[in-house]
Amino acid sequence: VAFSLRSLIPLVFFGAMHCGSSGANAGPSLDGGATDSAHAQPPSEGGAEASASSDAGASTETGARDGPMADSEGGAAGAATIDTFVGVNALITDSVANLAPIGVVREYHNWGWLGNNFNDLPYPQTLYTPDIPSFGWDWDSFFSGLQAMGVSGFPAVQGAAPWVNNSAVPPADGSPTAAASYIAHGDTMFQIAARWGKTKVADSVLKLESDQARKSGLGTVEYFEDYNEEDNAAGFTGDVFAAMASADYDGDEGRLGATIGVKTADPNAKLVMGGLSGRYGSGDTWVSSITTFLDAARTWSAAHRTDATFATDVVNVHYYSFGPGAPAPALSPEADGVEAKLAAVVSYRDQHMPGKPVWWTEFGYDTFGGSPLHAPALGSNSAFVVQGQWLIRELLAALAAGVERATVFELDDTCAPPASACNTQFATAGLLGMSGSPKPAWYYLATFRARLSSYTYVGTVPATEANVRVAQFADTKGSGGAFVVWMGTSNASVTPGYALSLPARTSTAKAVALTGGLATGIETTLTPSAGVVTLDVSETPTIVLYSP
């Protein structure tokens, strides 16, 4: 779905920047304006609600209850540590310093940006620092900058280049279900994997504009996504997409030549299928739309590939918790059953595509009340605070379902309220406002990742109070662990003095409250009594860290 952006940027957008999952769409911002330091404390978007006083923090009261037993309730645990699990959608113009604290970066990357030669079909020369127009974009520096800050980034190549007539499907003289129809797309995927992947290729196979540095094997990108919501506006069916994926993956098992596909360029590279939207409004359920698409992709692959395998390394989905319709607000992850929906996709993967991780690469909430995807104000908590609460709870639902990566949409707002454009879904879903000022959600996500960076999800723990949710984590770098505790309600509920049992031989514990204005939260020492600590539990998740 194409859309216009502010300033003069639309002139170079040849394909959709972001295809929303329902109705009208607003895409990623290109205005920058983010702060320069990951731990800078600029004025927070949302005013007073961004402060610590807006959230019910952890208390240091003591009490007693039976000890926890982490179980498998809520789905299979993913193996990813939190530093590689959580991430954000962004653009090259976004500040690396603002991206890095959130984690993995999914970079929207229009196919048309990669070449401007309209007369050299089907293989235009590739650009990595485009000169038309002269915005000075440099993807080499972008991905290396993320890597230097300990964060991985990957491009989501989307839309179509102008030299293929702005069509996502093959030209009229090509068969939509023939991998050979996508040789130009597979060639592009080869070129970017050759440059940013880990394997150097022969200089003679590089297709570059004359002003581009001749480089390969830079080792800054491992994953390469080959579309965005192909089942939405682009109109791909599963079999059609499987044909393109076969070209993008390994040049249709090498049949398309020695310079087609990411695996041909770098055997270590991973191809991520474009994130599926689930065709909102089609009459199908989201889960059945996803599985029907994957069924068709698998059927095509069984008939056309000798390995009989759908050519992707990752199962990739998008889901947003829309409410029943404007002006109703969006739904919390618990009210919308997000965990069960994602778990159904994971179960399908387990049965039909074992070994391929499931990623959830778009989810989010707007903060402007005119949007059909807006987080509501609840009690004393503003929409800005509730956005942050629900995003963390979305991450917890994904972990419980067995999802291995989750990237929130998106870093920046694309409009400033009360402009009418803000009534469009996704326009105010950013973690930063248009001024570059972080919302509470940015701080919540940064704290979640910073505090649990080396931790893996273990499972849920049965709670002793109604509506209290408890998730348990283990530290891969030590013998300690963590709980995350929250109310799974959407009415500003608080359970005071909740008794949380700690594992045997725990000697120290501390609570970390997610708070606007602080990228690592507010830490409070807890004193265990008979192996138990107490804390007030609110709808803002609280992290409890413990160690022997």
How would you describe each model-predicted region?
Residues 1-9:
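Bacterial N-terminal signal peptides that target proteins for export
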